[in-house]
């Protein structure tokens, strides 16, 4: 692995830590990290988290964006905040899916992206 790849991995790990801390700060529920580096070139990791209401979903997503910006990361975009049943925050190396529990159950992203790949499936925040 080249030095540039090491720096990129360290940066990606730092961004993931920022995201997980932000979700923990706002009491995100059932936080899961899915390592998709071997499955796609779109992103390194996906984080899936539930909110307890649409207001909570939106607040979680906004807090992730705010914390990332404060640490010097520029989000590529955020989608879904109008209905706030599923808000996607694209931080390039980390994509965050903040979902209402019923939407999360229906789409089952953890199962979809962990088939044939490595799923960290870690509880990184308390419920």
Segments predicted by a language model, with ranges:
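Glycine/charge-rich, flexible interdomain linkers and switch-proximal surface loops
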Residues: 33-42, 76-93
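Long, contiguous binding/interaction regions
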Residues: 1-38, 52-59, 71, 80, ...
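Compact, glycine-rich, soluble single-domain proteins
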Residues: 55-76, 88
